[in-house]
Amino acid sequence: MEVHERMIKRLVYRVSDIRPYINWLYFYHTWSMNGKPKEEKEKLRVEAETMLDEFETRYKTYAVFGIFDANSDEDDILIGDVRLPLLRQQRAKDNCSPHLCLSDFLRPLSSCIKDKVGAFATTVDTGMEFDYKHDDFRQMMAKVLAERLAEGTAEKMHEDVRRTYWGYAPDEHFTPEELHREMYQGI
C-alpha cells in the first residue's frame, strides 16, 4: 500500500494476537528475577500465562499510528503547517562525532522532496490494571502484564506497519525474538 500525504489507523488486537510478542526478559527483570532459580521463574511464568488466559475474553490492546509527509528545517520537523522544534544531543562528546537531531534523518525542506515521519501510541484496556485491586499480588501481576502487552502491541503494530500498511517490507518474516533484537532494516 502506498502512503500518500498521511495515513492514520487505529488497530485493535486480541491478547492472543500479542502473546507471541511479549518480551519475557523484561517481565522477569520487572520482578527482579535475574539470578533467581529457574523453578521460581517457571512458577511466575505459569501464573502470568494463567492471567493472560483470563485476559483473553475480557480485554483488548490498542494501537494508533500515523504516517505523514514531512521535511526538516534545521533542527525542526515540519508536518504540514506544524513545526516541531527538537533538540540536538546535549551530552558532551570526546570525539568529533556530530550531535544528532531527529530532523537529521528527514529530507530538508529545501530539497522540495517530501519525506515521511511516523508516530504511534499503544495502550491496553484499563481494567487490566484496576480489576484486581483486592489482591495485591494479582494487581501487581496485572500491571506488569499490561505493560508487557502494551510493549508487545507496539512490536506487533510495528510489524503490521512495515508489512501491510506502509508495505515497504511485505515479504519480511521475522520471529518475535528477531523483532526484539531489531534484526530488520529501516524503521
Protein language model features and the residues they cover:
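Charged, low-complexity helical/coil segments in non-catalytic cytosolic or luminal regions
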Residues: A150-T164
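Active-site loops and adjacent core secondary-structure elements that bind or stabilize anionic groups
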Residues: M1-M140, V144
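Intrinsic structural disorder
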Residues: M1, S110-I113, E151, P170, ...
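Short alpha-helical basic/polar micro-motif
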Residues: E147
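Short terminal or interdomain "cap/linker" segment that borders an active site or interface and mediates
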Residues: T164-I187
